[in-house]
A protein has these predicted regions:
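NAD(P)+-binding Rossmann beta1-loop-alpha1 motif at the extreme N-terminus of oxidoreductases
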Residues: 1-61, 128-129
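Short-chain dehydrogenase/reductase
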Residues: 18, 79, 184
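Internal alpha-helical scaffold of NAD(P)-dependent oxidoreductase catalytic cores
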Residues: 104, 108-114, 130-168, 179-191
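Rossmann-like NAD(P)(H) cofactor-binding subdomain of soluble oxidoreductases
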Residues: 48, 56-133
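Phosphate- and divalent-cation-binding pockets in alpha/beta enzyme and binding domains
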Residues: 16, 43, 77-78, 104, ...
Length: 191
C-alpha cells in the first residue's frame, strides 16, 4: 500500500488496524497517529514502533486517508478542528465511530468529501474480524479499494449499499461476538 494514512485516535481498534497493516508489510513511514490521551502515547509508540503525537492537524496533513478512530461523542469537535484542512486537502475520510452517518461527517468537515463508514468488531483485535463498509456517492472505486485493503488487515470485508443497514451491522457484527464469548465463558464455567 502506497497510501499515507492519518489515524485520528489511537485506541484499541486503531491499534488492531495498524498492527494488521504492519504485519502485511506496510511501510510504517506511511502511518501517522494522533492520540489525545498523554499516558497512552508512549505505550502506543513503543508497541507499534511509530511516532504518536497529540496534534490532529499535523497528522492529517501527512495523510491522504484520514481514519477517524475516536469516540462518537467527540467526533463533531474533532471534525471542527480539522474542517479547514479537510477542505484544503480533500482526503478520503474513513470512520469507525458507531452512529455517526456519512452525511454528518461530510457536513462537519465542510462537505464535498469522499466518506467511508466502517463497522469493525472485537475479533478484529485478533485479525479475525468482520467489517461492514459503506461508501457515500463521492467515493470512487480506487478509494473503495484502499478502504477495503485497510480493513482486510483485520478480517473479512463486506460492502453495504444502504447506509441504514449499518445499524444492523453494528448490532449483529459489532455486538454479536461479545455475546458468543460470554456464552463460551459461561459454558466453560459450568463444565
Amino acid at each position: 500500500m502506497n497510501t499515507s494514512i492519518a489515524f485520528i485516535g489511537g485506541g484499541n481498534m486503531a491499534r488492531s488496524i495498524i498492527g494488521g497493516l504492519l504485519k502485511q508489510g506496510v511501510d510504517k513511514s506511511r502511518l501517522h497517529v494522533s492520540e489525545p490521551y498523554e499516558p497512552t502515547r508512549p505505550a502506543l509508540a513503543d508497541e507499534l514502533s511509530l511516532q504518536v503525537v497529540n496534534d490532529n492537524v499535523q497528522v492529517a496533513l501527512a495523510g491522504q486517508v484520514w481514519l477517524f478512530a475516536v469516540k462518537p461523542q467527540v467526533m463533531k469537535a474533532v471534525c471542527a478542528e480539522l474542517k479547514e484542512t479537510a477542505q484544503a486537502n480533500k482526503p478520503l475520510i474513513i470512520s469507525i465511530a458507531a452512529g455517526i452517518t456519512a452525511t454528518q461527517l461530510d457536513d462537519w468537515l465542510g462537505g464535498g468529501l469522499p466518506v467511508v463508514r466502517v463497522m469493525p468488531n472485537t475479533p478484529a483485535l485478533l485479525g479475525a474480524g468482520a467489517n461492514g463498509l459503506y461508501a457515500n456517492e463521492r467515493v470512487d472505486d480506487g478509494q473503495k479499494h484502499i478502504a477495503e485493503q485497510l480493513f482486510r488487515a483485520t478480517g473479512l470485508c463486506t460492502w453495504i449499499a444502504d447506509e441504514a443497514l449499518m445499524n444492523t451491522v453494528t448490532a449483529l457484527s459489532g455486538s454479536g461476538p461479545a455475546y458468543v464469548f460470554l456464552l463460551c465463558e459461561a459454558m466453560q464455567a459450568a463444565a
